Amino acid sequence: METLLNAIPQETLLVIGAYGALGAAYLVVIPLFLYFWMNRRWTVMGKLERLGIYGLVFLFFPGLILFAPFLNLRMSGQGDV
């Protein structure tokens, strides 16, 4: 394994790392932040903030759809009898 990493140029490893970091931000970090933001501010958002959030949801949809089965965004108090 050591010789394999030495055979790959340093610039190539940096490019692979940069792609990995951008992919992680696009698919994990920003979508989780959007879920958190929408959950905290859903009932108090203004028109422009909601429009901006809708645009970000459209932009980061692939990452959001990855977490959709695991997150529950129902408002508190829903389902009480």
From Swiss-Prot:
Pfam families linked: NdhL (PF10716)
Location in or out of the cell: Cellular thylakoid membrane
Protein name: NAD(P)H-quinone oxidoreductase subunit L
InterPro entries: NADH-quinone_OxRdatse_su_L (IPR019654)
Gene Ontology MF: a single term: oxidoreductase activity, acting on NAD(P)H, quinone or similar compound as acceptor
Membrane protein topology class: Multi-pass membrane protein
Gene symbol of the encoding locus: ndhL
Cellular compartments per GO CC: plasma membrane-derived thylakoid membrane
The entry's keywords: Membrane, NAD, NADP, Plastoquinone, Quinone, Thylakoid, Translocase, Transmembrane, Transmembrane helix, Transport
Top enzyme class: translocase
Subunit structure: NDH-1 can be composed of about 15 different subunits; different subcomplexes with different compositions have been identified which probably have different functions.
Organism expressing this protein natively: Synechococcus sp. (strain WH7803)
Keyword Thylakoid: yes
Catalytic activities: a plastoquinone + NADH + (n+1) H(+)(in) = a plastoquinol + NAD(+) + n H(+)(out); a plastoquinone + NADPH + (n+1) H(+)(in) = a plastoquinol + NADP(+) + n H(+)(out)
Source organism, top-level taxon: Bacteria
Assigned protein family: Belongs to the complex I NdhL subunit family.
Function: NDH-1 shuttles electrons from an unknown electron donor, via FMN and iron-sulfur (Fe-S) centers, to quinones in the respiratory and/or the photosynthetic chain. The immediate electron acceptor for the enzyme in this species is believed to be plastoquinone. Couples the redox reaction to proton translocation, and thus conserves the redox energy in a proton gradient. Cyanobacterial NDH-1 also plays a role in inorganic carbon-concentration.
